[in-house]
Amino acid sequence: MDGDSSTTDASQLGIAGDYIGGSHYVIQPHDDTEDSMNDHEDTNGSKESFREQDIYLPIANVARIMKNAIPQTGKIAKDAKECVQECVSEFISFITSEASERCHQEKRKTINGEDILFAMSTLGFDSYVEPLKLYLQKFREAMKGEKGIGGTVTTGDGLSEELTEEAFTNQLPAGLITTDGQQQNVMVYTTSYQQISGVQQIQFS
């Protein structure tokens, strides 16, 4: 799905402002079946310019997660934090892009959990699929009909959340149950699911 090919603005058509202001109209082709990949476009049809840091996860959050994997006395250089920050953002874009392709093929606008699992399997991250599938099932069972923090949580194929920033600051307990039944002490950060009873963290290999 090429975002640039889905819009046509006046400058591309070579039409002056006076012409548009008259009784004539410029028709912009838009496929309603496409997802909202171009939501960041402004009213003129041109893409907004973003600072490089705007597309990354907050580096403080990335650093906090990294620090959990090293001894308390350990330190992490700034360039290492920035490197992981960029890698994580690229990974998210990589997975989401593949999931978005599936949505486009099936003429849907909303990426759901199954799309993410399908994308991870397609891109070779098979070892993550089964644990995530179990977690997604537990999550949906626990959140069914409940109110999420800061807004409504709906379940099913159109699973969506409106969560406040506070929801991303909590973490699950350290005891994890792996797919082979072994318990390990590994910290995994996620959204605020402390309130969900019966949800267990899963160790990824």
UniProtKB/Swiss-Prot annotation:
Q: Which UniProt keywords apply?
A: Activator, DNA-binding, Nucleus, Transcription, Transcription regulation
DNA-binding positions: 57-63
Give the span(s) annotated as B domain.
51-140
Give the protein's biological function: Component of the sequence-specific heterotrimeric transcription factor (NF-Y) which specifically recognizes a 5'-CCAAT-3' box motif found in the promoters of its target genes. NF-Y can function as both an activator and a repressor, depending on its interacting cofactors.
Q: Which gene encodes it?
A: NFYB
SUPFAM superfamilies, from UniProt?
Histone-fold (SSF47113)
Q: Does the keyword Ligase apply?
A: no
**UniProt biased composition (Basic and acidic residues):** 37-50
Q: Where in the cell is it found?
A: Nucleus
GO CC, any one term: CCAAT-binding factor complex
Q: What is known of its domains?
A: Can be divided into 3 domains: the weakly conserved A domain, the highly conserved B domain thought to be involved in subunit interaction and DNA binding, and the Glu-rich C domain.
Annotated region (A domain), positions in chain: 1-50
Quick one: where's region Disordered? 24-50
- Species classification: Eukaryota, Metazoa, Chordata, Craniata, Vertebrata
Fill in the subunit field for this protein.
Answer: Heterotrimeric transcription factor composed of three components, NF-YA, NF-YB and NF-YC. NF-YB and NF-YC must interact and dimerize for NF-YA association and DNA binding.
Q: Which family does it belong to?
A: Belongs to the NFYB/HAP3 subunit family.
UniProt record, GO biological process: regulation of transcription by RNA polymerase II
Q: What is this protein called?
A: Nuclear transcription factor Y subunit beta
Q: Mainly localized where?
A: nucleus
* Disulfides per UniProt: none
Q: Which domain of life is it from?
A: Eukaryota
Per the record's keyword annotation, is Transcription regulation included, yes or no?
yes
Supply the source organism for this entry. Gallus gallus (Chicken)
Give me the ranges of the annotated region Subunit association domain (SAD). 84-95
Entry GO MF terms: DNA-binding transcription activator activity, RNA polymerase II-specific; DNA-binding transcription factor activity, RNA polymerase II-specific; protein heterodimerization activity; sequence-specific DNA binding
Q: Which CDD domains match?
A: HFD_NFYB (cd22907)
Query: Entry's InterPro entries?
Result: CBFA_NFYB_domain, Histone-fold, Transc_fact_NFYB/HAP3, Transcrpt_fac_NFYB/HAP3_CS
